[in-house]
Amino acid sequence: MKGNEIRSRFLEYFKGNGHTVAESSSLVPKDDPTLLFTNAGMVQFKRVFMGDDKRGYVRAVTSQKCVRAGGKHNDLENVGYTARHHTFFEMLGNFSFGDYFKEEAIRLAWNFLTVELGLPAEKMWVSVFEDDDEAFALWEKVEDLPKGRIVRLGEKDNFWAMGDTGPCGPCSEIHIDQGVGSSPCDNPNCAVGCDCDRFLELWNLVFMQFNRAEDGSLTALPRPSIDTGMGLERVAAVLQGKFNNYDSDLFAPIIAVLEDISGVKYGAAADTDTAIRVIADHARATSFLVADGVLPSNEGRGYVLRRIMRRAVRYGKKLGLEKPFMDRVTKAVCAEMQNAYPQLVATAALLEKVVNNEEERFRETLEHGLVQLDEKISQLLTSGGDAVIDGPFIFKLYDTFGFPFDIVRDIALERGVGFDEAGFATAMAEQRAKSRASRKGEGVKLHDEGVKALADAGKKAEFLGYEGLEADSVVEGLLSEQGSGVEKLVAGEKGRVFVAATPFYAEAGGQMGDRGSVRWQGGQASVYATQAEGTGLILHDLLVEEGELSLGLEVTLQVDDEERKATASNHSATHLLQAALISVLGDHVKQSGSLVGPERLRFDFTNFSQLTAAEIAQVETLVNEQIRNNAVIATDVLSKQEAIAGGATALFGEKYDDDVRVVSMGDYSRELCGGTHVGATGEIGLFVILSESGIAAGVRRIEALTGRAALAYVQGRLSTGNELADLLSCKSGDLVPKVESLLTAVKEGEKRVAQLAGQLASSGLDDLLNNALTVAGIKVVVAEVPLENAKALRELGDKVRDNLESGIAVIGGAVGGKVALLAIVTKDLVDRIQAGRIVSEVSGIVGGKGGGRPDMAQAGGTMPDKLSEAIASVPAIIEAML
């Protein structure tokens, strides 16, 4: 059975058993700072299991994209060397949120494996937690599970916990006996629980029934849940009679491409087999990480991706691949998996650019780094001491050549030397500490005690700002400027206020929070920021200008009308801008960030090259065309699945509720967005791009203006153009050719001036030579000459040298408020006196220094008023040196 069929059967089977098919979440977890990547099917349901979130269903089934590389769950160093380790894999899982429990989970899993997939029951084994008598008894009731096939194991193997505290529970694993000889094993008592692959774990059923307190005690959860996981790659290999995941059909097309481009046959040799497996795996991880918005960088998720990509390139060298090849391999990944994951098609162009750019950049430094590493290892192996690559050296390779630690480790293991991982980590930590220190002072959002108290009290605000800009409400919470709860704020004090309902939009989704005022009988305050805290809290940062603001007071909240309109205009323009960028550059364009305020907008997006002037103009034109179309901007609340299916654009990594707000601008733009917008595109008025720049590898930034700000900018540019036209006595439309003509004339004039200066300096050559002095029997030419530039002095010096058969010359002049000196000694005299010594001595008088060859030397100085004195001293200086 093919891997794609297994995936489809799994989803359809559980759908037929009352489960909702939930789409795979992004590899970038939205609300879990403890994880670099989504590494299990339950990650997207973590808040559901903890009771902090609810879904519109109690049964779910997924085929979840997972990455285990970096952080606690890191399989990177094992990839390629074992039959089962991957950086990227798919986890098939079914989930129950307080619905069915152990008996149903066991029944569903057993039936799928033995009936749907046809795996032989006689080869199956089951493990349960040693104290889970309930699960043991339920498995004993499974009629076609052979007797004696249930094994009790300890907490290490069969008890699962989300963390040190929180939901946890025993688990039951289903294993298949692949037979003697299926996996190397030296244990004569090999059985379920052995580290070899003979008794291969297929499926893990987690019974979340307890909550673990900080003291380690367990209490029963009111609504026990189910979380299961089965690796698609693993079950595909088993069904296809393979003992290695990489031998299944999921990898075959990728390996075939590698065989084609390298000329190396898979299965020919152990070392090249390892390289092929590494590249095949890493190409899958690269393809899906880029598709989910991760780009190579030097920190966080981007650094893990860079490590994966560069490790693949390095293993490519083992296959003789000296030219870029990863693009062809990732294309094979996309071709194989695009039906199950259509986003691979949408991001194909971006993936191609990312892969080619990263591989080319790394290849530029790879050879240099490999040479240094090889020299280091050779030195260690011949030194007779401990053959350990020191941490600072490994860090130097990382910092200078972009060598991830993994590459150094792999090569060290291959060459039989040690590596100082702790020393490398220390050097890395020191660098990060310096980086953090340099960023000291950047703003940090604090969740203080007052905010926590409001959240714990279940406070939530109703947002009324879509319908109007003014609303009456009641003060339900007050915080001091320091963040603690207070009863009142008086005139002159800053603080934060929470009300039951507000028209103020809280900063979110890149849109700045509203500003405005709060009024009450006998007082008022100015709101200078609005922020969202926790779940549902909207806090107004304000300054009390008059009166006393206290709890329970009835107030009127008024959003600044002009600022809201300007912000809405800029926000709507960012939607049009993204659509225009996709139209001009391609579907790889994805939003990477934005900042929308009343003054201007900033939009960050993925693209691996600078936009040309023509592309910028085209984008600007497209946006303004949509503004002139004056399309109605409509908002609808739809299910997330319905919105995405309808073509709505979602922000990578953003977590959305099951019901989402969709903002549509005619047929041109359709995005998931909770921000505020104008009523029709025509209200934007005008759109002008101020700048386009790069902010990171593969990320560009556009800053732009709309409405009145854009008009003022254009008027300012026109005014400046008119002033320049008046100054140059031409029409505004002729400014460019007029300026080009003037620049050409200036350059020609400068060239002519330089020529004349050279001629003027050279014209006195005969006079210089005829007026030469004699010092100790040697002809000495000494002169102070007018100079246009330093080049004129060198040209004069060349002519003096060519015409001075035997002698010394020292020439000086003032250029741009500084002194330029030149000394020449003919070759027959350099054994007696050197030009460098002469010019060094003379330049000291004019506050400078210099040097050069024995026959010619130059110097500079900062005291042109001392030049005559310096020139006059030359004969005495030469006489003293002879």
Curated annotation (Swiss-Prot):
GO terms for biological process: alanyl-tRNA aminoacylation; negative regulation of DNA-templated transcription. Keywords: Aminoacyl-tRNA synthetase, ATP-binding, Cytoplasm, Ligase, Metal-binding, Nucleotide-binding, Protein biosynthesis, RNA-binding, tRNA-binding, Zinc. Binds 1 zinc ion per subunit. Its cofactor is Zn(2+). It is an enzyme of class 6 (ligase). It holds the Pfam family DHHA1. Zn(2+) binds at residues 571, 575, 673, 677. The keyword Acyltransferase does not apply. InterPro entries: aa-tRNA-synth_II/BPL/LPL, Ala-tRNA-lgiase_IIc, Ala-tRNA-ligase_IIc_anticod-bd, Ala-tRNA-synth_IIc_core, Ala-tRNA-synth_IIc_N, Ala-tRNA_ligase, Ala_tRNA_ligase_euk/bac, DHHA1_dom. It is found in: Cytoplasm. CDD domains: AlaRS_core. GO terms for molecular function: alanine-tRNA ligase activity; aminoacyl-tRNA deacylase activity; ATP binding; tRNA binding; zinc ion binding. It catalyses: tRNA(Ala) + L-alanine + ATP = L-alanyl-tRNA(Ala) + AMP + diphosphate. GO terms for cellular component: cytosol. Its EC number is 6.1.1.7. PROSITE patterns: AA_TRNA_LIGASE_II_ALA. PANTHER family: ALANINE--TRNA LIGASE, CYTOPLASMIC, ALANYL-TRNA SYNTHETASE. Catalyzes the attachment of alanine to tRNA(Ala) in a two-step reaction: alanine is first activated by ATP to form Ala-AMP and then transferred to the acceptor end of tRNA(Ala). Also edits incorrectly charged Ser-tRNA(Ala) and Gly-tRNA(Ala) via its editing domain. Belongs to the class-II aminoacyl-tRNA synthetase family. Consists of three domains; the N-terminal catalytic domain, the editing domain and the C-terminal C-Ala domain. The editing domain removes incorrectly charged amino acids, while the C-Ala domain, along with tRNA(Ala), serves as a bridge to cooperatively bring together the editing and aminoacylation centers thus stimulating deacylation of misacylated tRNAs. This is Alanine--tRNA ligase. It comes from Desulfotalea psychrophila (strain LSv54 / DSM 12343).
